Amino acid sequence: MYIIFRCDCGRALYSREGAKTRKCVCGRTVNVKDRRIFGRADDFEEASELVRKLQEEKYGSCHFTNPSKRE
């Protein structure tokens, strides 16, 4: 099980449930237990999709796509 949360910089992240900390790309070490949880996912693929959607809601589309999803 994975949980989805945000860093103080605003970036959406995911981590395994039970993990104590997670390192954000901004350099901060985030204490997972103190974060507001935005969602839960059963596997890492579902978690990464939820993170991608949260990022697009906040910052807009980045135009990077998975090659298997191109039409």
From Swiss-Prot:
This is Protein MTH_1184. Gene3D superfamilies: Structural Genomics, Unknown Function 30-nov-00 1gh9 Mol_id. It comes from the Archaea. It comes from Methanothermobacter thermautotrophicus (strain ATCC 29096 / DSM 1053 / JCM 10044 / NBRC 100330 / Delta H) (Methanobacterium thermoautotrophicum). InterPro entries: DUF1922 (IPR015166), MTH1184 (IPR036304).
